[in-house]
Amino acid sequence: MNPLAPVLTIDGPSGAGKGTISRIIARRMGWHYLDSGALYRAVGVAASWADIDTSDASALVRCTFDTHVQFVEQGESMRVMVNGTDATDELRLETTGALASAIAAIPEVRAALKERQRAFRELPGLVADGRDMGTVIFKDAPYKVFLTASAEERAERRHKQLKDKGVSVNFDDLLREIMARDARDAQRTVAPLKPADDAVLIDTTGIGIDDVVARVMDLLPVPAA
């Protein structure tokens, strides 16, 4: 970790566009990228593979330390390796997202992952995508953004994404899952989902990716040539 490296935090609920926007900006700036949600999902997948009960906090903490996560860029996409296995597709499942949300509510797990996330802070800079990047992990980040969108729009985006991948899912079920996750994330006692006091709020409902990227880029220094 390099405390001198600038950090842009992009927080927000599931489906607000954090991942897409963060990856684009990281490429444009030439900065490192942290998908904190993928870390929680990776621990969830590893725990599932090991048949660990999500109520067993001590076992989950051990799993957190034992799980090796690697981000591998493939063209425009990012593959996530969990203990040497490509778990990208499994990490994107709604069931995995729900599992990650449940695990994220456990204080011991969040504490175990805190330093692993901070270790991504290196020069020339870092774009950190998550739910508590600006409020907990990188409180001193000079650039903070909170993306949001209506639950309906986020469900529509996710529904289209899954449909394009050939995955059949009921829209109403998807909407209910997203709303339930929103409630869990906002109501947990440790690091609840909320914008940092100094974050710039951007509602992406009805706004294209290019427009959102432009708004965020306006907050940052001119990228190095």
UniProtKB/Swiss-Prot annotation:
It catalyses: CMP + ATP = CDP + ADP; dCMP + ATP = dCDP + ADP. InterPro entries: Cytidylate_kin, Cytidylate_kinase_dom, P-loop_NTPase. The keyword Hydrolase does not apply. Keywords: ATP-binding, Cytoplasm, Kinase, Nucleotide-binding, Transferase. The keyword Nucleotide-binding applies. GO terms for molecular function: ATP binding; CMP kinase activity; dCMP kinase activity. ATP binds at residues 12-20. It is found in: Cytoplasm. It is an enzyme of class 2 (transferase). Its EC number is 2.7.4.25. Pfam families: Cytidylate_kin. Disulfide bonds: none annotated. One of its GO terms (cellular component) is cytosol. GO terms for biological process: nucleobase-containing small molecule interconversion; pyrimidine nucleotide metabolic process. Belongs to the cytidylate kinase family. Type 1 subfamily. This is Cytidylate kinase. It comes from Stenotrophomonas maltophilia (strain K279a). The gene is cmk.
